[in-house]
Structures are given as structure tokens and as C-alpha cells.
Amino acid sequence: MAAPGTPPPSASGGGGGEPRQLPELIRLKRDGGHLREADIRNFVHAVIDGRAQDTQIGAMLMAIRLQGMNLEETSVLTRALAESGQQLEWPKAWHQQLVDKHSTGGVGDKVSLVLAPALAACGCKVPMISGRSLGHTGGTLDKLESIPGFGVTQSPEQMLHILEEVGCCIVGQSAKLVPADGILYAARDVTATVDSVPLITASILSKKAVEGLSTLVVDVKFGGAAVFPDQEKARELAKMLVRVGVSLGLKVAAALTAMDNPLGRSVGHTLEVEEALLCLDGAGPPDLRDLVIRLGGAILWISGQAETQDQGAARVAAALDDGSARRRFQLMLSAQGVDPGLAKALCSGSPTQRRQLLPHAREQEELLAPADGIVECVRALPLARVLHDLGAGRSRAGQPIRPGVGAEVLVDVGQCLSRGTPWLRVHLDGPALSSQQRRTLQGALVLSDRAPFKVPSPFAELVLPPTIAQP
């Protein structure tokens, strides 16, 4: 089922000429030069076989961050990363059905937990390779691991079986899949090179290229809690993702979505699983449901499984409302190690019953509105940073987390709020919130004196490949 990827051409092949030594490559990119294919492949080989020192990897990443890469360089880097490990192979009859979604990271972003089973209920095959929380953003794998027994490590053969029986699986990146990206990703996090368009593009698309997809939609976040606060910079990334995807023979679209407020009302691993289950019940926060339906509709339309984006969105909404998406989620839980009785209880139980089945923090503290006003914004970044400090996130790979730590936002953006009304409930294992943490959290609540308003959808725009016309 899984076969080793075709070994990349030798660094002396492609792009012309013999490969240059690493210091020369670093100097060339530092000074704004363009790297040949042979140079890029030589660098990736050196990362994998240990010839590249940590200092050289960091220097090259910083050179790329400061000087950028053109389309050709970014495409070559993406292919070289993808070819550094195994390629996943699926039955040819599945090709049109093989789809996925990726997010650049946000606060309260539990879309994958809902969207993957919803797409499976619509007839798709979703081999989703996800990540863990790092910094202030949550990780899909950590959220799922708050469910007792859920296993994110699945072999290619196990993934094939789950896709045959369920239609979706959500797994972690293994050492055999895109190992070069794993090394560069860890280095980017500690060298202040995360916010690089070519490096983000190559990292995302190399992982998705090995999945053997027909269609990918990337949720590119912008705003106060996103990698790119500015929508124009996020649009630059979206366009690069689409163009490199075309060069790889992959249909890639990018949705620009706002990440100023948390998505939904819950932040934290267990709390987000419970909110995802509400959405799978056909309920849940409107902004979460809206984003799931819009992203799912785009995927079904672009992959040719719906005639229009609206038709695709209607099918995803129906899967949420008729329970078929929730049934797929239950099957996925059982297939990935959760006791079938627990999986059934989680998916068919009430919110109160679900709360008794998942790990929760020992204490709760509520924060009160300091004044009257209209809720203009609940700033996601300071909220996420406090929860990170309380144990919901990790500062280094492998660090344990507290799945029950989190927060419930008790108000909606746009609503009228009276002084002394609870607006946030924090779940923590103790000790109590410090005065500084309380000040930071209270600073996340932005009040205004304008009239109440209805918050717009977080979905801002969709960047499509040139072969597909805007709806």
C-alpha cells in the first residue's frame, strides 16, 4: 500500500551544474540570489543525512525568510521535501474522492474534527495528516488524544483499511513521511522563520503531496491571532499555495478566513472536542458551522463531486443535520482505538453525559465584564497565551499538555453586555489565576458604545486555481 518515494535526483542533476557547498548556498541566498534545483536538492539531502549542521539549517532558513523564493524555487523545495520519504498510494478508483483540508493555525480551530467526517459522509476519502499544538495555536492531534484511547499513529496499511471502512482518518506525521519537513519545521519554530511564505508553502504542500490527493483546500488565517495579521500578506501566501499546487499537478484552493476572535466559543482540547460534537449534532456555534460548510462545499465543488460550491455546501450541511457525519466520526473513533462503547456514548450522549466521559480541569473561574458596552471583539491571542501558560499548550515538541485546561467564551461578538455579567469561564487545574493573568484576560474583551451588530462570517474570500472560474 505504501511504497518508498522515488529517490530524488542526485544533487548534481537538474538545474544545471554541480551542486555548491552549503556555505556557498547560504551566502547566495543571503545576498538575494536564486538557487538552482541541484542546490535545493543538495540542501534537502544534507538535512536528511546529517551533513547540514543546525547552524547551517538555521542560517539557510533565515536567508530564505529575508530574501524569499520565486515560484520555481518554492516548487522545487516542495517536491524535494515530499520525495524525502514514503509516498502514500491508494486505489486508482479513489482519485477524484481523495481530498483534504489544512489550516495555517488558529485559536479554537476545531474545523478538522467536523469537516473530515462530514466529507466522508458525502462520499470522500480523507487521509488527513495533522499536527500538534505549538506556541499559541491548538493542534488537531492533541484535541483527539483527549478522547481516551484515540491513536494518532497509524501505518499506511491501517490508514487504507480505515479509509475503506470509514472514509476518513486523522493521523500524525511519521518519521517515514516527509522527514525533511519535520526537521525544517522544528528548526523554523526556534529560529523566528515561521512566517515565511515559501517555507510555509513547501511545508504544507509537501505533506499533502504524499497523501496522493486530487484536491486540497487550505484555510489561510489572517488577523490578530494568525501567522499573518494582514489580509494582504495572507493573500500572498494563498496565491503561492495555489500556484505551487498547480506546478505539482494538485488542485489547490485557499480560503482566507479571519482569526481575530476564537472560532466558536470553546478553546482547549477537551472543550473543543465537545463543541465539535455539538456541530456534528447539527447545532453548535454559527461561525464554526458556517466555516465547516463553506470549506466543505468548496472541496466538493473543486474536486468535481458537486456542480456548484453552493450545492456542495448544502450536501455538507445535510450531513451535519441528518447525523451521517456524526456516525462517521463515531466509526473513525472506533477504528483508531477508542472503545466502541465509549465512541457510541460520546456521539449519542447529551452534552452533560459527554462531559463525564472526557478529562476536565479541576477548577473553574469566571471573569466579569468591567463595564457596560457592546462586545466589539474577544481577542484570541491574549486568551490563547494565558491558556498556554496554564498548560493547554506546549513550548517545545514533546512537552506534555493538560487536555482539560481551556476557556468558554460566554458572550457573542456584537451583543450588548452589562457590567458584572460573566463573559469568560476558565477551566484550570490550579493554582488560581494570577492577577497578571486576569489582567491579560480582561484585556482580551474589547467593548464599544456602538449599536449591537451581527458578526460577519469568518470566511473572507476563496483563491482558486486558474482552471476553475469564480462562482
From Swiss-Prot:
<dbReference type="Pfam" id="PF00591">
    <property type="entry name" value="Glycos_transf_3"/>
</dbReference>
<dbReference type="InterPro" id="IPR036320">
    <property type="entry name" value="Glycosyl_Trfase_fam3_N_dom_sf"/>
</dbReference>
<dbReference type="InterPro" id="IPR018090">
    <property type="entry name" value="Pyrmidine_PPas_bac/euk"/>
</dbReference>
<dbReference type="GO" id="GO:0046074">
    <property type="term" value="P:dTMP catabolic process"/>
</dbReference>
<feature type="binding site">
    <location>
        <position position="203"/>
    </location>
    <ligand>
        <name>substrate</name>
    </ligand>
</feature>
<dbReference type="GO" id="GO:0051969">
    <property type="term" value="P:regulation of transmission of nerve impulse"/>
</dbReference>
<dbReference type="InterPro" id="IPR036566">
    <property type="entry name" value="PYNP-like_C_sf"/>
</dbReference>
<feature type="binding site">
    <location>
        <position position="102"/>
    </location>
    <ligand>
        <name>substrate</name>
    </ligand>
</feature>
<keyword id="KW-0328">Glycosyltransferase</keyword>
<protein>
    <recommendedName>
        <fullName>Thymidine phosphorylase</fullName>
        <ecNumber>2.4.2.4</ecNumber>
    </recommendedName>
</protein>
<keyword id="KW-0808">Transferase</keyword>
<comment type="function">
    <text>Catalyzes the reversible phosphorolysis of thymidine. The produced molecules are then utilized as carbon and energy sources or in the rescue of pyrimidine bases for nucleotide synthesis.</text>
</comment>
<dbReference type="InterPro" id="IPR000312">
    <property type="entry name" value="Glycosyl_Trfase_fam3"/>
</dbReference>
<feature type="region of interest" description="Disordered">
    <location>
        <begin position="1"/>
        <end position="21"/>
    </location>
</feature>
<feature type="binding site">
    <location>
        <position position="188"/>
    </location>
    <ligand>
        <name>substrate</name>
    </ligand>
</feature>
<dbReference type="GO" id="GO:0009032">
    <property type="term" value="F:thymidine phosphorylase activity"/>
</dbReference>
<dbReference type="Pfam" id="PF02885">
    <property type="entry name" value="Glycos_trans_3N"/>
</dbReference>
<dbReference type="GO" id="GO:0000002">
    <property type="term" value="P:mitochondrial genome maintenance"/>
</dbReference>
<feature type="compositionally biased region" description="Pro residues">
    <location>
        <begin position="1"/>
        <end position="10"/>
    </location>
</feature>
<dbReference type="GO" id="GO:0031641">
    <property type="term" value="P:regulation of myelination"/>
</dbReference>
<dbReference type="GO" id="GO:0009887">
    <property type="term" value="P:animal organ morphogenesis"/>
</dbReference>
<comment type="pathway">
    <text>Pyrimidine metabolism; dTMP biosynthesis via salvage pathway; dTMP from thymine: step 1/2.</text>
</comment>
<dbReference type="Pfam" id="PF07831">
    <property type="entry name" value="PYNP_C"/>
</dbReference>
<dbReference type="GO" id="GO:0006206">
    <property type="term" value="P:pyrimidine nucleobase metabolic process"/>
</dbReference>
<feature type="binding site">
    <location>
        <position position="207"/>
    </location>
    <ligand>
        <name>substrate</name>
    </ligand>
</feature>
<dbReference type="GO" id="GO:0006213">
    <property type="term" value="P:pyrimidine nucleoside metabolic process"/>
</dbReference>
<dbReference type="GO" id="GO:0006935">
    <property type="term" value="P:chemotaxis"/>
</dbReference>
<dbReference type="InterPro" id="IPR013102">
    <property type="entry name" value="PYNP_C"/>
</dbReference>
<dbReference type="InterPro" id="IPR000053">
    <property type="entry name" value="Thymidine/pyrmidine_PPase"/>
</dbReference>
<dbReference type="InterPro" id="IPR017459">
    <property type="entry name" value="Glycosyl_Trfase_fam3_N_dom"/>
</dbReference>
<comment type="similarity">
    <text>Belongs to the thymidine/pyrimidine-nucleoside phosphorylase family.</text>
</comment>
<dbReference type="GO" id="GO:0042803">
    <property type="term" value="F:protein homodimerization activity"/>
</dbReference>
<dbReference type="GO" id="GO:1905333">
    <property type="term" value="P:regulation of gastric motility"/>
</dbReference>
<dbReference type="GO" id="GO:0004645">
    <property type="term" value="F:1,4-alpha-oligoglucan phosphorylase activity"/>
</dbReference>
<keyword id="KW-0597">Phosphoprotein</keyword>
<feature type="modified residue" description="Phosphothreonine">
    <location>
        <position position="6"/>
    </location>
</feature>
<comment type="subunit">
    <text>Homodimer.</text>
</comment>
<dbReference type="InterPro" id="IPR035902">
    <property type="entry name" value="Nuc_phospho_transferase"/>
</dbReference>
